[in-house]
Design a protein with these regions (language model features):
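Bacterial N-terminal signal peptides that target proteins for export
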Residues: 1-12
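N-terminal signal peptide c-region/cleavage motif recognized by signal peptidases
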Residues: 17-18
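Sequence context of c-type cytochrome heme-c attachment sites
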Residues: 22-109, 120-152, 182-233
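Short cysteine-rich clusters marking metal-coordination/redox-active sites
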Residues: 33, 82, 113, 159-162
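Helix-to-catalytic-loop junction in kinase catalytic cores
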Residues: 86, 117, 163
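Substrate-binding/catalytic groove segments of enzymes
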Residues: 122-124, 167-177
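Repeat-solenoid scaffold signature
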Residues: 139-171
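Compact mixed alphabeta submodule
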Residues: 157, 172-183, 192-194
Length: 233
């Protein structure tokens, strides 16, 4: 009887793990995000993050690659040590996979929306629901709801995962494969979060309507909202 109970508990535990794995948020891609956030998408499309995958191609960024002791004539688009920081969700459910069309409908072959905001399958519908609630009853939705469904608000950590992922980095979570593009190679690779996001924002910022309230709130949000544009009617 005891053995039977142990086996039963083991099966139950495995079932829970399987359910958790199935429930993990997946990446949906830029096209899904920009169905509603089209203005942000248009602004992002002109940034270097939108074109990040192109720099892995042969004969692209020649001088930069030479400085980092890489071969400018080599195609790095299928190098797993490079692709992770030039795509969205590499190695994660629904994320970019080697050989996938980087410019396909999802545009996962770029540093897109979810590279900063997190895999969107679980929280994206909550945005629509919250906006309808705001319009209907003038009530905001707790931001912790979308945070609990995978939306990321720790932008500094998201940036550091690539921009500070080199040997000797001050970023404690830095780990192999390390980027060869370090401040010792060229001073332009020195990354300071506050300075970088203010001088090279990843997209235009628009005034928020108040669909969500409460923590977590990125510390830079208040500054961006001071100069944010009104959303055109």
């Amino acid at each position: 009887m005891k053995r039977f109970l142990q086996q039963l508990l083991s099966v139950a535990a495995l079932a829970c793990l399987a359910q958790a794995a199935v429930a993990a948020p997946t990446y949906v891609g830029v096209k899904v995000c920009t169905k509603c956030h089209d203005l942000y998408g248009d602004a992002w499309a002109g940034t270097s993050h939108a074109k990040a995958f192109d720099s892995l191609k042969a004969n692209s960024k020649v001088e930069e690659k030479k400085k980092a002791k890489l071969d400018p004539a080599k195609d790095y688009t299928k190098d797993k040590d490079c692709v992770g920081c030039h795509s969205t969700g590499f190695g994660k459910p629904g994320g970019y996979t080697l050989g996938k069309d980087p410019g396909g409908p999802e545009r996962l072959g770029s540093v897109g929306c979810e590279a900063c905001h997190g895999a969107g399958s679980d929280y994206r519908d909550e945005h629509g629901t919250a906006e309808k609630k705001l319009l209907r009853s003038q009530q905001s939705t707790p931001r912790k709801l979308i945070a609990g469904k995978g939306q990321n608000f720790d932008y500094e950590k998201a940036c550091a995962a690539c921009h500070l992922n080199f040997q000797g980095s001050p970023h404690k979570a830095a780990k192999a494969p390390f980027t060869p593009f370090t401040p010792t190679v060229d001073a332009k690779y020195k990354f300071e979060f506050d300075k970088a996001v203010r001088t090279k924002a990843l997209h235009e910022h628009y005034k928020l309507k108040g669909a969500f309230e409460g923590e977590p709130v990125p510390k830079i949000r208040a500054d961006f909202q001071k100069t944010a544009k009104d959303i055109p009617e």
